[in-house]
Amino acid sequence: MSGTIFIISAPSGSGKSSLVNELRHVVPGLEFSISYTTRAPRGSEQNGREYFFVTREKFDAMLAADEFLEHAEVFGECYGTAKHFVTEALARGNDLVLDIDVQGAAQLKVKLPDAVGIFILPPSRKELEARLKRRNLSDHVAPEVIERRLKGAGKEIENFSHYDYILVNDNFETAVEQLRAIVLAERIRRSSTQISEENRAILEAAECCIRKNAMQRVQSILDSFKDATDPQP
């Protein structure tokens, strides 16, 4: 059985990295692509675990050598997925998780049309702003930087329709369970074995995150960003 590529994207501050890290512990047999980035590590991040932290010169050299399957610049920093992570995982028949932004995801969906896209949303603009402020408090990030990221998030969220599943991270434990269900549901659909009651429950849990079934929740989140940018009377 061939492996599945899972593309996971989210606006900055939506909790994507924490969810993906937890997914490592609750779903066996998953491989994780580690992106290269020119940005500095945050908090407890370690080189080779969350990212490979490289200089701009190193990144540009890899780009010139055609080592990236996708790459993008986000808030002035470069991110890229090395080709070998994907080719090696597919050769082994393993599932692979790619934690990338919407620019990189768009590139990959062209090259890997069968990849499963998962978009993680914050519950509202207000909550995302609060999360960004908490995360950046120790880094002494200027208010205008947070505002720029909020505006960027509003634009990123408009890309939700390019993804197969939509997951709202308003409760971490629930979001982890939904993310786990999505991955396992895709495995079940690829399998020819009879569906058990346990598997049926997994399929039902994933079903609520399919884009068309999450539209009411998505619309309220979109509205929260629109309301913040509309001029007040």
UniProtKB/Swiss-Prot annotation:
Guanylate kinase-like domain span: 3-184
Single GO MF descriptor: ATP binding
Compartments, record wording: Cytoplasm
Keywords of the record: ATP-binding, Cytoplasm, Kinase, Nucleotide-binding, Transferase
Domain of life, per lineage: Bacteria
Reactions performed catalytically: GMP + ATP = GDP + ADP
GO annotation, cellular component aspect: cytosol
Pfam (any one): Guanylate_kin
Binding locations of ATP: 10-17
Record-annotated disulphide pairs: none
EC number: 2.7.4.8
Known function: Essential for recycling GMP and indirectly, cGMP.
Xref: PANTHER family: GUANYLATE KINASE (PTHR23117:SF13), GUANYLATE KINASE-RELATED (PTHR23117)
HAMAP family linked to this entry: Guanylate_kinase
Family: Belongs to the guanylate kinase family.
Record protein name field: Guanylate kinase
Natural source organism: Koribacter versatilis (strain Ellin345)
